[in-house]
C-alpha cells in the first residue's frame, strides 16, 4: 500500500507536552467497527469491559538512555536503543561524522564509552568499561529519552523521570515508554479488578526505532526495526484459556499487541516467546491473538497508524482521527487514548 494513504494533518496544538493529571483523567475515544464514536475518559474503562476480559500490559521500564558528552572538543549525543550484552549497547549517535572506531566519548559523571563499530544502519556499538552495570551508569549520567516531537519543543526535566514511566514498569531495557499504560493508576486497577477484569503482563523492550519515520513510498519496502520481548509459558496458558472460554484479550498498547501476535501461530494458539520481533502489521493482516486494543494517537504515516488501520480499517481510523483532532484530543506519548474494539 502507498504510505501516503496513511497521512493526515495534525495541528501542533494537538500534541501533548505533559500528561493529564491524574493520569486516568485523560480522554478516551471509543471506536467500534461502525456506529458513532464515543467521547469518554480513561476512568470509564471498567464500564466498557466485561467480566473475564483480559488486559495485557507491557512491564518494560524506560531507562534514561539519552547521553550528552564530548569527544575531544566536539559535542556528541547518544541515544542507546538496544542492549547487545552486559557492557555493550547499540546507539544512535548525533554529530558522529568524525567519530572513528576506538574513539572515547566522555559523558560526564564518570561515565565513558568507546565507539567500537559503526553498523550498516548508521548506528554505533558503544562499549562502557568498568564494573558497574550500564543501567546504573545511565541513572547517573542519562536523561529520559523523550520522543522528538516533545523534546523538540521543551527540555527534558526531572518530572519526566516519573511521567514517562508506567506503574507496571519492572524490567529495565526500554528507551521509549509503552504509552497506553501511562494512563493507569492504582485506583483504576482496583476498579477493573472489582469489575472482574483480569490482567497479564509481558515484556517488550521498546526501541528508539519506534520513532523512525517510514521513508519508503510503499509499505512493502519498509524495513521494520527489531525489539526484544518475552512471554512466559504460564502467561500464554492463561491467555489461551481465557480465549477458549470466550473472553476477550485486549492489548494495552501496540507493543503488547505486536508481541502477542508474534507469539501466536496460524492455529491462534499463543506460545511462550523469547527473542527479537520485527513484525510489521498493515491492512490485510489477520489478527490471531487479540480482540481489542487500547492505544494512544499516533503520527501520520507511522507504522503504528498502519497497525490501527489494519485492526479497524483505514477509512474508519481516518474518520476517528478526524473526530479526535476536531474535538481537541491530545496526541502522541503524553496524550489521550483510544479503545479499539473491532
Curated annotation (Swiss-Prot):
Top-level lineage group: Bacteria
InterPro entries attached to this UniProt entry: QueA, QueA_dom1, QueA_dom2, QueA_sf
Annotated keywords: Cytoplasm, Queuosine biosynthesis, S-adenosyl-L-methionine, Transferase
GO molecular function list: S-adenosylmethionine:tRNA ribosyltransferase-isomerase activity
An example Gene Ontology CC term for this record: cytoplasm
A biological process term (GO) from this entry: queuosine biosynthetic process
SS bonds (residue pairs): none
EC annotation from Swiss-Prot or TrEMBL: 2.4.99.17
Cellular compartment(s): Cytoplasm
Reactions it catalyzes: 7-aminomethyl-7-carbaguanosine(34) in tRNA + S-adenosyl-L-methionine = epoxyqueuosine(34) in tRNA + adenine + L-methionine + 2 H(+)
Enzyme class, UniProt record, top EC level: transferase
UniProt pathway: tRNA modification; tRNA-queuosine biosynthesis
HAMAP family: QueA
Protein role: Transfers and isomerizes the ribose moiety from AdoMet to the 7-aminomethyl group of 7-deazaguanine (preQ1-tRNA) to give epoxyqueuosine (oQ-tRNA).
Family: Belongs to the QueA family.
Subunit structure: Monomer.
PANTHER family with a match to the protein in the record: S-ADENOSYLMETHIONINE:TRNA RIBOSYLTRANSFERASE-ISOMERASE
NCBIfam families: PRK00147.1 (NF001140), queA (TIGR00113)
Protein name as annotated: S-adenosylmethionine:tRNA ribosyltransferase-isomerase
Organism: Novosphingobium aromaticivorans (strain ATCC 700278 / DSM 12444 / CCUG 56034 / CIP 105152 / NBRC 16084 / F199)
The encoding gene: queA
Amino acid at each position: 500500500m502507498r504510505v501516503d494513504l496513511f497521512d493526515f494533518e495534525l495541528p501542533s496544538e494537538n500534541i501533548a507536552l505533559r500528561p493529564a493529571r491524574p493520569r486516568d483523567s485523560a480522554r478516551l475515544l471509543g471506536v467500534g467497527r461502525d456506529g458513532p464514536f464515543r467521547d469518554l475518559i480513561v476512568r470509564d474503562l471498567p464500564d466498557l469491559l466485561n467480566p473475564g476480559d483480559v488486559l495485557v500490559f507491557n512491564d518494560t521500564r524506560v531507562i534514561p538512555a539519552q547521553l550528552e558528552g564530548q569527544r575531544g572538543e566536539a559535542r556528541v549525543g547518544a541515544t542507546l536503543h538496544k542492549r547487545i550484552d552486559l557492557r555493550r549497547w547499540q546507539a544512535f549517535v548525533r554529530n558522529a561524522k568524525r567519530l572513528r572506531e576506538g574513539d572515547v566519548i566522555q559523558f560526564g559523571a564518570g561515565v565513558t564509552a568507546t565507539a567500537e563499530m559503526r553498523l550498516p544502519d548508521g548506528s554505533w556499538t558503544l562499549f562502557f568499561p568498568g564494573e558497574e552495570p550500564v543501567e546504573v551508569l545511565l541513572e547517573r549520567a542519562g536523561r529520559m529519552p523523550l520522543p522528538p516531537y516533545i523534546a523538540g519543543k521543551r527540555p527534558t526535566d526531572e518530572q519526566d523521570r516519573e511521567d514517562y514511566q508506567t506503574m507496571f514498569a519492572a524490567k529495565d531495557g526500554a528507551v521509549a515508554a509503552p504509552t497506553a499504560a501511562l494512563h493507569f493508576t492504582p485506583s483504576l486497577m482496583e476498579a477493573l479488578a472489582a469489575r472482574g477484569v483480569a490482567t497479564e503482563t509481558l515484556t517488550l523492550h521498546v526501541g528508539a526505532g519506534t520513532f523512525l519515520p517510514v521513508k519508503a513510498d510503499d509499505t512493502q519496502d519498509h524495513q521494520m526495526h527489531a525489539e526484544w520481548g518475552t512471554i512466559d509459558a504460564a502467561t500464554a496458558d492463561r491467555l489461551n484459556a481465557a480465549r477458549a472460554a470466550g473472553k476477550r484479550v485486549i492489548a494495552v498498547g501496540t507493543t503488547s499487541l505486536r508481541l502477542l501476535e508474534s507469539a501466536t501461530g496460524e492455529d491462534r494458539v499463543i506460545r511462550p516467546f523469547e527473542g527479537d520481533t520485527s513484525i510489521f502489521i498493515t491492512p490485510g493482516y489477520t489478527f490471531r491473538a487479540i480482540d481489542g486494543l487500547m492505544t494512544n494517537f499516533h503520527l501520520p504515516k507511522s507504522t503504528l497508524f498502519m497497525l490501527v488501520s489494519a485492526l479497524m480499517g483505514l477509512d474508519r481510523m481516518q474518520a476517528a482521527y478526524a473526530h479526535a483532532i476536531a474535538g481537541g484530543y491530545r496526541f502522541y506519548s503524553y496524550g489521550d487514548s483510544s479503545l479499539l474494539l473491532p
